A protein has these predicted regions:
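Metal-dependent nucleotidyltransferase catalytic core
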Residues: 1-3
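Conserved nucleotidyltransferase catalytic core and NTase-mimicking acidic/glycine-rich helix/loop elements
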Residues: 8-144
Length: 151
C-alpha cells in the first residue's frame, strides 16, 4: 500500500487524495525495517526451498529479494519510498532471466543485507508512524464523506 502513495504514475488525484499524498511521510517509520525484513526472509525461504526441492532457484524469488533490500534501504536512508528501481533495473532483469550466476546474485544479496542493517541503525525515521496525524486525516475524510463534501 505504501508503494501506491509513492508511485510516480498518477492518472488523477481527488482533493482527498492530495491530502493523503501530503501526509504520506507520516506512514514511514523504523517499523519499515521489521516489515521489509519479514518480506526478505520470506523470499529467502522460498529460494532455499527451491534449491532443496528442485536443485535450483526460481530467479524471480532472487530478484524480488534483492529488490526488497534495495527498496527498504532507500526508505531507511532517504525517508522516501522508491518504487522505480532505476539504475538497478537491468541488473535485476538479468537476475530474473537467470543470466546472472547464483554466486554473484547471492554476493549482491549479502552486500545489500549489510547496507540494509546499517541503514536501519542510522535512519532518522521516527520509531513509529505518526498515528495521530493519520487518524486525524481518516476522521476528517469520513466526516467529509458523510457530509457529501467529497466527489
Amino acid at each position: 500500500v505504501l508503494e501506491c502513495l509513492y508511485s510516480p504514475i498518477v492518472d488523477s488525484v481527488t482533493p482527498l487524495g492530495e491530502g493523503l499524498l501530503a501526509i504520506r511521510e507520516c506512514f514511514l517509520s523504523k517499523l519499515i525495517f521489521q516489515t521489509y525484513s519479514g518480506y526478505v526472509a520470506s523470499q529467502f525461504k522460498k529460494m532455499q526451498t527451491d534449491i532443496r526441492n528442485q536443485g535450483r532457484v526460481k530467479w524471480k524469488h532472487v530478484m524480488h529479494l534483492i529488490r526488497l533490500l534495495l527498496s527498504g534501504t532507500a526508505v531507511l536512508t532517504d525517508g522516501v519510498m522508491v518504487v522505480d528501481v532505476g539504475c538497478h533495473r537491468e541488473r535485476l532483469l538479468t537476475i530474473k532471466r537467470g543470466e546472472m550466476p547464483f554466486g554473484e546474485a547471492d554476493a549482491w544479496r549479502k552486500e545489500l543485507q549489510v547496507r540494509f542493517e546499517y541503514a536501519f541503525r542510522m535512519t532518522r525515521l521516527p520509531e513509529r508512524p505518526d498515528y495521530e496525524r493519520v487518524n486525524a486525516f481518516l476522521v476528517d475524510a469520513r466526516r467529509r464523506a458523510l457530509s457529501e463534501e467529497l466527489p
